[in-house]
């Protein structure tokens, strides 16, 4: 976004807030027939116990402590994602929360915020060094394509379709006094697994079992935060 990173010496007490992991979106590809309208089928699943937000917050804290070793870094819970999005807290390179939230941050001595929010962008999914996909993706989830034949990298076995875990989110570093967004990065990360990885090799959704699905999203979150947070300092 062309914003200035924050010098390490400027960040005294950093609060980390994640509001991008409370739901999972499953996007099923539907071949387009000339229409410019997104034809994909989308299903959202709400997650309890903060979903992936707790994991994302902890991963961001670990990276922030490396980036700003002299700062006190702690996780915060400000408000539900829907409230932050509906209230337009973050727009036009400004952070404008309700007065009560701002007063709470100032009373707690928070000088800066690291805010993780969902990001919507075109579906560009990594597959063998190429980008594939249609429509748009947002937040955390899985893209399911049951049409494109994809081989397993390890065995060469051919499967009909693939499953792509994705993490589309934004990380913003905010100066609480004045509400300035000092740095911001939008992230569109993904991985892919051939349908041939499933036990029957028929449905790409089965390419990863439930534990592997969770681990795949966690890897994307952790690796992207490790990549971008160090860039937010000079």
Predicted feature descriptions by range:
Residues 30-149, 153, 166-170, 174-184:
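N-terminal segment of the mature soluble domain
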Residues 1-25, 124, 129-234:
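C-terminal/domain-edge helix-coil "capping" segments
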């Amino acid at each position: 976004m062309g914003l200035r990173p924050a010098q390490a010496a400027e960040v005294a007490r950093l609060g980390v807030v994640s509001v991008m992991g409370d739901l999972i979106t499953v996007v099923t590809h539907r071949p387009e027939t000339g229409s410019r309208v997104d034809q994909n089928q989308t299903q959202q699943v709400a997650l309890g116990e903060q979903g992936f937000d707790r994991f994302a917050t902890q991963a961001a804290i670990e990276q922030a402590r490396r980036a700003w070793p002299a700062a006190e870094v702690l996780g915060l819970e400000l408000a539900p994602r829907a409230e932050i999005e509906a209230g337009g807290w973050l727009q036009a390179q400004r952070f404008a929360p309700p007065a009560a939230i701002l007063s709470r941050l100032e009373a707690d001595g928070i000088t800066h915020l690291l805010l993780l929010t969902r990001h919507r962008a075109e579906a560009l999914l990594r597959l063998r060094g190429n980008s594939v996909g249609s429509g748009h993706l947002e937040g955390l989830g899985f893209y399911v394509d049951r049409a494109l034949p994809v081989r397993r990298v390890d065995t060469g076995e051919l499967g009909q379709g693939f499953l792509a875990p994705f993490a589309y989110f934004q990380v913003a570093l905010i100066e609480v006094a004045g509400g300035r967004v000092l740095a911001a990065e939008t992230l569109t990360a993904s991985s892919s697994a051939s349908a041939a990885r499933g036990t029957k090799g028929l449905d790409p959704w089965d390419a990863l079992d439930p534990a592997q699905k969770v681990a795949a999203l966690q890897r994307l979150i952790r690796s992207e935060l490790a990549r971008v947070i160090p860039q937010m300092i000079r």
